[in-house]
């Protein structure tokens, strides 16, 4: 039987598992400073991750945000614990970190898991690979104790990266996937599912508050919701299918004119994506409407446009979610401003979008596995 939403979702901070997040400088800014951005973006256009394999408490975990739009937090793996900085990602489902056996140049600049130093480690003969927009990793499935704040998952399956290609300038060690599990004979159980199954969290929900602050204030919470992080009421949106954090969008408009998604479209809410991604033709139309100019794989615009351009409104389940110009116009390290709209390079049979951190900073988001839906409300 579905659990009672009104009692289960609203909780007070003393009953919460809160995990702090940090906002880290994106690969884009790192590469811009090294004059490497254009080459990398041509080689690795945005696409969703593709993966192949051969209690009653609410935990709120802080995340960190450094200068741009990736939000990372700390976890530990092993006994004694080894600490890693990971991206909490609703667009993928696997937890992985680099192995000490990985000799790729990308692995060498990150914290690597030393399996021989953990008394609770065990390996398997299962291998896998994951392709993200920015690169590919290959690894093996292993098991060990994983801790997210006060949450503990014993004998948790996770990936150990043995080789990494791409990922230039990555500012986090690994990824903690929070999407639905993918059906495969060899795929490890996602950590959220294992925590849920072993009763470590009382309700099958997690939520994100992504602060606009450059460093502190962002959190991911497990097992319920702290209502102090949002204003008003949560508006619930059913998932398109109970296997992915994708919802239906009614339309996208500006100045009361529909500019995209005229017949409805799908949108993935992806904490692992920095921007708002959509079909190339429609993104180009939006860039023209707001007056941006393409240059070096970005669309630049006058910084003063934040004071004159209207909001772009995503209507979801009958509710309007404005994205103001102050959110979709970003200032780079050189002082020039550019837009937060990006074209998806992988074509799909239907119109689909990705609502990344530009959208999620504006709206507190609750991911409800118990009822296969997402809750949205204006963030505090």
From Swiss-Prot:
<feature type="active site">
    <location>
        <position position="270"/>
    </location>
</feature>
<feature type="glycosylation site" description="N-linked (GlcNAc...) asparagine">
    <location>
        <position position="74"/>
    </location>
</feature>
<feature type="active site">
    <location>
        <position position="89"/>
    </location>
</feature>
<dbReference type="GO" id="GO:0005576">
    <property type="term" value="C:extracellular region"/>
</dbReference>
<feature type="disulfide bond">
    <location>
        <begin position="102"/>
        <end position="107"/>
    </location>
</feature>
<keyword id="KW-0964">Secreted</keyword>
<keyword id="KW-0378">Hydrolase</keyword>
<feature type="disulfide bond">
    <location>
        <begin position="303"/>
        <end position="337"/>
    </location>
</feature>
<dbReference type="Pfam" id="PF00026">
    <property type="entry name" value="Asp"/>
</dbReference>
<feature type="domain" description="Peptidase A1">
    <location>
        <begin position="71"/>
        <end position="377"/>
    </location>
</feature>
<comment type="similarity">
    <text>Belongs to the peptidase A1 family.</text>
</comment>
<dbReference type="GO" id="GO:0006508">
    <property type="term" value="P:proteolysis"/>
</dbReference>
<feature type="disulfide bond">
    <location>
        <begin position="261"/>
        <end position="265"/>
    </location>
</feature>
<keyword id="KW-1015">Disulfide bond</keyword>
<dbReference type="GO" id="GO:0004190">
    <property type="term" value="F:aspartic-type endopeptidase activity"/>
</dbReference>
<feature type="glycosylation site" description="N-linked (GlcNAc...) asparagine">
    <location>
        <position position="125"/>
    </location>
</feature>
<keyword id="KW-0732">Signal</keyword>
<dbReference type="InterPro" id="IPR001969">
    <property type="entry name" value="Aspartic_peptidase_AS"/>
</dbReference>
<dbReference type="Pfam" id="PF07966">
    <property type="entry name" value="A1_Propeptide"/>
</dbReference>
<keyword id="KW-0064">Aspartyl protease</keyword>
<keyword id="KW-0325">Glycoprotein</keyword>
<dbReference type="InterPro" id="IPR012848">
    <property type="entry name" value="Aspartic_peptidase_N"/>
</dbReference>
<dbReference type="InterPro" id="IPR001461">
    <property type="entry name" value="Aspartic_peptidase_A1"/>
</dbReference>
<feature type="signal peptide">
    <location>
        <begin position="1"/>
        <end position="15"/>
    </location>
</feature>
<keyword id="KW-0645">Protease</keyword>
<protein>
    <recommendedName>
        <fullName>Pregnancy-associated glycoprotein 4</fullName>
        <ecNumber>3.4.23.-</ecNumber>
    </recommendedName>
</protein>
<feature type="propeptide" description="Activation peptide">
    <location>
        <begin position="16"/>
        <end position="53"/>
    </location>
</feature>
<dbReference type="InterPro" id="IPR021109">
    <property type="entry name" value="Peptidase_aspartic_dom_sf"/>
</dbReference>
<dbReference type="InterPro" id="IPR033121">
    <property type="entry name" value="PEPTIDASE_A1"/>
</dbReference>
